[in-house]
Amino acid sequence: MNGSVFQKDNKFYLKVKGSGEFEMGLVSEGYRKLSTLIYLILSGSLNKNAILFWDEPETNMNPKLISHVTDALIKLSQMGVQVFISTHSYFVQQSFNLFAEYQNKGKNKLDIQFMSLYKDIENGKLKCEKSKDLSEISHNAIMEEFDAIYDKEQELIE
């Protein structure tokens, strides 16, 4: 993000290089979310040993900004912030999966866990499945729907 966040007269603003200052209520949801992260970091609220819970960070966000959010969350984790997110987004899930599989190496390797909550068909109980490897999660509604739409597309083009 090519800007900075500041507070003036009890209001938050985003200052964008070459574009001016914008009251936070007037910027897009994606920039507002990124700005909030920046402000929490600069104010010291998100530091080593802090915990961040974020439900569906992709909600109301331009898909082009999702990688910036996932990159920021990974950097926060590398700084020592424990990050928990929930998502229904293929893009968010795959961004973390690609990082975990191909980039999460070395002495600062993060302990990334993928989890899926689902209802057991046999007894109706809520269950949790977790793994360090996303491909080992068998109850993955995101991938199930991705596969279903892919199969539908294949049927339509044949």
Each model region followed by its residue ranges:
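Switch/communication elements of ASCE P-loop NTPase nucleotide-binding domains
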Residues: V16-I157
